[in-house]
């Protein structure tokens, strides 16, 4: 027995060693083998902040940590955390770059870098959250200088906590000597508050299509500006190969003033604005990108690869610190009528000499002498530039304690100018079937108004209540809106009134409607639901409401201007008809007002000034109801629907929508609790979304993150991100039962090899999720490009369940690239044979010893001579080796595992636990009661 134990110990060590020698195929996907590095000795500088003598300012060296790119057109990223958490300001940039090695570099600000590695391939992204460019350097381009008293805000509650440096290495020949590169930038940071805050205004196209062969194609973007005045002082343009010139203008009273104009084929750094121009509320920021389709044989779309195109204009500005915004976007296609008057200079390409193109060596530009190679086989590289991110997914912030706030029915949400969250709730009052009579008159006046504060302003991070108001004012609160001055606009469906409350004031500044008196004239409302305020004109709009089905517009002091809308008269509602206009949101850069037409299950948008219908957004996923809608800068609408009626299967969830075309970009649900009646939604500029529920009495916070199966761009191939550990499962229950099944599988494999026409390919079979974002999509896959027989081949396949001739088979496989680093098939077979050989040798030895000691009579004591050694191994002899008995003598051993594997029908068997939820999943839902049009 001691000898047997020693043998098993040796086998264990052999298998353990073989496991250590096995190189996981997942290592192919790791960005870099070295997770941490320090600055190379060849690099000058320090990773620590350097204090300025006699000043509280300090400098940070943000550099590559001694890298040696091995491929041309490599993009590498490096993150640096701000050394302090308090608010600070970046006031100067000093580049450290050699034009012979680095093509260009960009410095981003964000809060969540895409990687925690010391540096990484930027094709995996720069940041997980929203990022903005602070600085850009390109060879032969002038440096960016911030004006005196201007700084980028970092740290604190609203600023970026991380810097992410991106360096594009153009020609790898510069690294033939294997030197280490430390390209980067030194930033000077001060804790002193700056009177002017710098920011970036991004104007970009999301839907341009460039037909093949067209000589000139225009991409026009224009947005109405409605924020406080900004002062542009630098600009940067960006397109890919087809861009000829990008021009940006301010349009004021029909007059076009140039902000900046440049060829995107020249170094793409920030260039100074030549003629100072300010942009004020009411101005239009207009951008035109001039493209050519010459040389293309198919249409070109907006996208992130070099074979796609982009139309981006970055305007670096400064504005007064009191109401500064560090990042703004415009993605709206310009009206053709507006661009009829664009200056002709926007249609004239800026010539770029061939010498300049050669000198730039940009990976996206190809001259006639150097055409694109292998375009049919190679995936296009991606570049880190701003494009409408349609891979972002909203997930509940499960660490946010606000979901546990003790509130009543949550009817309204809004964000104040400081991005604090305001919650409008009903305290101990409840809207039910006894609240109103058939004439919409409130029946519970006797209980008095809500005695607690109905408006709570909470910190968006900690959910700490910062202030509260609204005691003894309201009976059944409904909608809440906060204007740019911090005033609260609320509605009360019991009072049939609209209120304007000043920040910090208990007495209303303005009251419209007659208390407890429903009506349909200009001085009455009937259960008004929501208010929206135009940030430019100050005019406000009232959704009225549950019983009037109209939108009313008033001047800032409450004078009636106009109204539109009528009750839906058929099963197919026409534009401008409503069945409970329940929620309003302004789209200020388009001058539009969007309405959640609740019981018609759609969103309608109108020109705010005229009330003319523009468009509707309606999807089957909405179901029968859309409760609330909210617009966020950047062209995104957020909405929530209601519980499905009987016969409808649409789940209760939130939606992220592309405002331009109405497409659904994402859906989201809570991780804690469940949506019951999500009643209102509020979206912040950074993509954070809050949802309030009138039945669950809760508020959820959702934060943007990459989708669970997010696309990770690696080495020119888009793959699904894989976790470090993957379980390789062997389904013994699914194995073929007969030799006939094995023969069928062998024939199928041989047939596949014949079809491959000499190209050896491994099937990649991890689940693939294809994302269609309105631009040419690339299949996201857990596939690594293989080269076999000299021909690179990719197979993009989803996992399928193979069934053949009565055999149920499910193969769950992870691709292992066959290489010298892996374990060969021969070695595996050898390791499997060794223990069998050892056991046979042990049995022979035991047999030999017994024969020597007791003689040949032992063969007849317990078995026939025909059984032989195999009989001993099966445990038929008292002196033989019984494997079951041997293992069963060990502590903790159970035979259940062996018994289960030996069951013939195991692939049809099912544990009791496996089906515990089956009845609940597949049973028909009960018929719900008729919905009550309340809340």
Swiss-Prot record:
Cellular component aspect of the GO annotation: extracellular region; transport vesicle membrane
Start and end residues of each stretch annotated as Peptidyl-alpha-hydroxyglycine alpha-amidating lyase: 391-712
Intragranular topological domain residue ranges: 37-825
Reaction(s) catalysed (UniProt annotation): a [peptide]-C-terminal glycine + 2 L-ascorbate + O2 = a [peptide]-C-terminal (2S)-2-hydroxyglycine + 2 monodehydro-L-ascorbate radical + H2O; a [peptide]-C-terminal (2S)-2-hydroxyglycine = a [peptide]-C-terminal amide + glyoxylate
Pfam families: Cu2_monoox_C (PF03712), Cu2_monooxygen (PF01082), NHL (PF01436)
Composition skew (Acidic residues), residue ranges: 909-922
Binding site for Cu(2+) A: 103-104, 168
NHL repeat ranges, renumbered to this chain: 463-504, 512-557, 565-609, 662-705
Record text on cofactor binding: Binds one Zn(2+) ion per subunit.
Spans annotated as Peptidylglycine alpha-hydroxylating monooxygenase: 1-390
GO molecular function: copper ion binding; peptidylamidoglycolate lyase activity; peptidylglycine monooxygenase activity
Cofactor field: Zn(2+); Cu(2+)
Ranges of compositional bias, category Polar residues: 755-764
Compositionally skewed regions (Pro residues) per UniProt: 925-935
Membrane topology: Single-pass membrane protein
Residues holding a protein: 426, 546, 598
Subunit and interaction comment: Monomer.
Function: Bifunctional enzyme that catalyzes amidation of the C-terminus of proteins. Alpha-amidation is present at the C-terminus of many endocrine hormones and neuropeptides and is required for their activity. C-terminal amidation also takes place in response to protein fragmentation triggered by oxidative stress, promoting degradation of amidated protein fragments by the proteasome. Alpha-amidation involves two sequential reactions, both of which are catalyzed by separate catalytic domains of the enzyme.
Protein name: Peptidyl-glycine alpha-amidating monooxygenase A
Source species taxonomy: Eukaryota, Metazoa, Chordata, Craniata, Vertebrata
């Amino acid at each position: 027995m001691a000898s047997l134990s020693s043998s098993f110990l040796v086998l264990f060590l052999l298998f353990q060693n073989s496991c250590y020698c096995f190189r996981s195929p997942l290592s192919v996907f790791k960005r870099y083998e070295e997770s941490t590095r320090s600055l190379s000795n060849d690099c000058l500088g320090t990773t620590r902040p350097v204090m300025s003598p006699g000043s509280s300012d300090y400098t940070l060296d943000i550099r590559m940590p001694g890298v040696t790119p091995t491929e041309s057109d490599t993009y590498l990223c490096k993150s640096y955390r701000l050394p302090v958490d308090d608010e600070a300001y970046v006031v100067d940039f000093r580049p450290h770059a050699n034009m012979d090695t680095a093509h260009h570099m960009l410095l981003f600000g964000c809060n969540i870098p895409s990687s925690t590695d010391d540096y990484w391939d930027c094709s995996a992204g720069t940041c997980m959250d929203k990022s903005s460019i602070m600085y850009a350097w390109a060879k032969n381009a002038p440096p960016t200088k911030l004006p005196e008293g201007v700084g980028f805000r970092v740290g604190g509650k609203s600023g970026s906590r991380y810097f992410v440096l991106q360096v594009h290495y153009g020609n790898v020949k510069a690294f033939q000597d294997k030197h280490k590169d430390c390209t980067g930038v030194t930033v000077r940071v001060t804790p002193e508050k700056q009177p002017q805050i710098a920011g970036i205004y991004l104007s970009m196209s999301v839907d341009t299509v460039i037909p093949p062969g067209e000589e000139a194609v225009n991409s026009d973007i224009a947005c109405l500006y409605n924020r406080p005045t900004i002062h542009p002082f630098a600009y940067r343009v960006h397109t890919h190969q087809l861009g000829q010139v990008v021009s940006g203008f301010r349009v004021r009273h029909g007059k076009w003033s140039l902000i900046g104009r440049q060829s995107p084929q020249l170094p793409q750094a920030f260039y100074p604005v030549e003629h100072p121009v300010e942009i004020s509320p009411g101005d239009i920021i207009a951008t035109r990108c001039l493209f050519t389709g010459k040389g293309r044989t198919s249409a070109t779309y907006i996208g992130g690869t070099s074979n796609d195109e982009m139309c981006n204009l970055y305007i670096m500005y400064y504005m007064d610190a009191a109401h500064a915004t560090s990042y703004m976007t415009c993605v709206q296609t310009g009206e053709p009528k507006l661009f009829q008057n664009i200056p002709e200079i926007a249609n004239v390409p800026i010539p770029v000499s061939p010498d300049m193109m050669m000198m730039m060596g940009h990976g996206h530009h190809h001259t006639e002498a150097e055409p694109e190679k292998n375009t049919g086989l190679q995936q296009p590289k991606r570049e880190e530039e701003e494009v409408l991110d349609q891979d972002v997914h909203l997930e509940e912030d499960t660490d946010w304690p606000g979901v546990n706030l003790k509130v009543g029915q949550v009817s309204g949400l809004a964000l104040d100018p400081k991005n604090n969250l305001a919650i409008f709730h009903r305290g101990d009052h409840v809207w039910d079937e006894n609240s109103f009579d058939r004439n919409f008159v409130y029946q519970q006046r006797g209980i008095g108004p809500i005695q607690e504060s109905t408006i709570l302003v909470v910190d968006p991070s900690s959910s700490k209540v910062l202030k509260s108001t609204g005691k003894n004012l309201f009976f059944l609160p409904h909608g809440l809106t906060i204007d740019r001055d911090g005033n609260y606009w609320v509605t009360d469906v019991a009072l049939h009134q609209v209120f304007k409350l000043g920040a910090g004031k208990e007495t209303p500044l303005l009251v419209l409607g007659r208390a407890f008196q429903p009506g349909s004239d200009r001085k009455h409302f009937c259960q008004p639901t929501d208010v929206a305020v135009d940030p430019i004109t100050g005019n406000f709009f009232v959704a009225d409401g549950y019983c009037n089905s109209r939108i009313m517009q008033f001047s800032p002091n409450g004078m009636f201007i106009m109204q539109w809308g009528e009750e839906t008269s058929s099963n197919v509602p026409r534009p401008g008809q409503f069945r409970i206009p329940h929620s309003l949101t302004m789209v200020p850069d388009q001058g539009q007002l969007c309405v959640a037409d609740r019981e018609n299950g759609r969103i309608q948008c109108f020109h705010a000034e005229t009330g003319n219908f523009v468009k509707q957004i309606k999807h089957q996923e909405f179901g029968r109801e859309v409760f609330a809608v909210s617009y966020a800068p950047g062209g995104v609408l957020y909405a929530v629907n209601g519980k499905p009626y009987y016969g409808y299967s649409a789940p209760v969830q939130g939606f992220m929508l592309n405002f331009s075309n109405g497409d659904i970009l994402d859906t989201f649900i809570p991780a804690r609790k469940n949506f019951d009646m999500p009643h209102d939604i509020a979206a912040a500029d950074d993509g954070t979304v809050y949802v309030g529920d009138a039945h669950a009495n809760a508020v959820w916070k959702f934060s943007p993150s990459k989708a669970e199966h997010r696309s990770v761009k690696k080495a020119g191939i888009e793959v699904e991100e894989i976790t470090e550990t993957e379980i390789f499962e062997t389904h013994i229950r699914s194995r073929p039962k007969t030799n006939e099944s094995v023969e069928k599988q062998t024939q199928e494999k041989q047939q596949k090899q014949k079809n491959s026409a000499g190209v050896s390919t491994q099937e990649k079979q991890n689940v693939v999720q294809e994302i269609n974002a309105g631009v040419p999509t690339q299949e996201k896959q857990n596939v690594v490009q293989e080269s076999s027989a000299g021909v690179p081949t990719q197979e993009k396949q989803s996992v399928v369940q193979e069934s053949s001739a009565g055999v149920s088979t499910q193969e769950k496989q992870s691709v292992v690239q066959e290489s010298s680093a892996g374990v060969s098939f021969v070695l595996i077979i050898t390791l499997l044979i060794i223990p069998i050989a050892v056991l046979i040798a042990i049995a022979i030895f035991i047999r030999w010893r017994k024969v020597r000691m007791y003689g040949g009579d032992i063969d007849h004591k317990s078995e026939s001579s025909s059984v032989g050694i195999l009989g001993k191994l099966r445990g038929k002899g008292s002196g033989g080796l019984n494997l079951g008995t041997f293992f069963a003598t060990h502590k903790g051993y159970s035979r259940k595992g062996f018994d289960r594997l030996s069951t013939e029908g195991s692939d049809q068997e099912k544990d009791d636990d496996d089906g515990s939820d089956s009845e609940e999943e597949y049973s028909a839902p009960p018929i719900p009661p008729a919905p009550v049009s309340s809340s």
